[in-house]
Amino acid sequence: MSKIEQIAKDLVMPILEKNNFELVDVEYKKEGSHWYLRVYIDKEGGITLDDCQLVSEYLSDRLDEVDPIEHSYILEVSSPGLDRPLKKPRDFERNIGKEIEISLYTPIDKRKKFEGELIEFTGDKIIILYNGERKEFDMKNVSLVKPVIKF
């Protein structure tokens, strides 16, 4: 986490805690000629537009007071979306029993992607039901995990 991301995280936590929101992620990056500070939040039942506005206004005021960013940037506060990557233990716990897609750094059985039902997460390992059998993946070899969205 960069210094700017850490400052934004520290500044936004009071409003999140007050409203029982979860901080999913903070990212500060340049896209094209613009810098973006993005804050992704969530809560039980899902985040609303009003929730995002509340957090955005609060964080904008705090950032103006501290002024940690020397150049212009765009502040965005949003929900992480349905297909957000699973990163924290809580993300995995919420998705037990659901279909996930796992991408690997190093292939297993000549494959780098697996899809199956998440049946267990231990912190070090992800265990899915893949083609009717338990399959374990070491987190050190996992590059990305995200839910499978079916409509």
UniProtKB/Swiss-Prot annotation:
Cysteine disulfide links: none
SUPFAM superfamilies named in the record: YhbC-like, C-terminal domain, YhbC-like, N-terminal domain
A biological process term (GO) from this entry: translation
Transmembrane segments: none
Record GO cellular component, one term: cytosol
Location in or out of the cell: Cytoplasm
Record's keyword terms, sorted: Cytoplasm, Ribosome biogenesis
A matching Pfam family: DUF150_C
Coiled coil: none
Cytoplasm is among the record's keywords: yes
PANTHER family: RIBOSOME MATURATION FACTOR RIMP
Family: Belongs to the RimP family.
Job of this protein: Required for maturation of 30S ribosomal subunits.
Protein name (Swiss-Prot/TrEMBL): Ribosome maturation factor RimP
Protein's organism: Thermoanaerobacter sp. (strain X514)
Primary gene name: rimP
